[in-house]
From Swiss-Prot:
One example GO MF annotation: nucleic acid binding
One Pfam family hit: UPF0102
InterPro entries membership: Restrct_endonuc-II-like (IPR011335), tRNA_endonuc-like_dom_sf (IPR011856), UPF0102_YraN-like (IPR003509)
Protein name, as recorded: UPF0102 protein PD_1586
Upper classification of the organism: Bacteria, Pseudomonadati, Pseudomonadota, Gammaproteobacteria, Lysobacterales
Organism: Xylella fastidiosa (strain Temecula1 / ATCC 700964)
HAMAP family per UniProt: UPF0102
PANTHER family: UPF0102 PROTEIN YRAN (PTHR34039:SF1)
């Protein structure tokens, strides 16, 4: 049985593979900044995609995607801004925020494109 950290890492790897099979290109994983972390940064047809990966064994407390609340969205936006400052060649490219939620065993992934917008934060 995997511990919480290993389980999260396995779900992130599965999410990355899922997105790559869908045609996205991987740019970075687990990018940490003070106050926030980006699970995956991908590139999709002229867009930088910041991906939050969430996992829930059971949905008794809501779906994994529902756990990306306003506070978490703000942290993701702040981390995305810092990422773009460090990679200025991407700063002029449109960006979006996606969520990949994993649930159950065996793992099932659900990709939510454009899961939230800046004005949702």
């Amino acid at each position: 049985m995997l511990n919480r950290r290993d389980c999260g890492a396995a779900v992130e790897v599965a999410a990355r593979r899922h997105l790559e099979r869908a045609g996205l290109r991987w740019l970075a994983s687990n990018v940490c900044f003070r106050g926030g972390e980006l699970d995956l940064v991908m590139y999709d047809v002229m867009s930088v995609v910041f991906v939050e990966v969430r996992y829930r064994q059971q949905e008794s407390h809501g779906s994994a995607a529902q756990s990306v609340d306003r506070r978490k969205r703000r942290k993701l936006v702040m981390a995305a801004q810092l990422f773009l400052q460090r990679h200025p060649f991407l700063a002029q490219v449109p960006c979006r925020f996606d969520v990949v939620e994993g649930a159950g065993r065996p793992l099932q992934l659900h990709w939510i494109r454009d899961a939230f917008r800046l004005d949702d934060c």
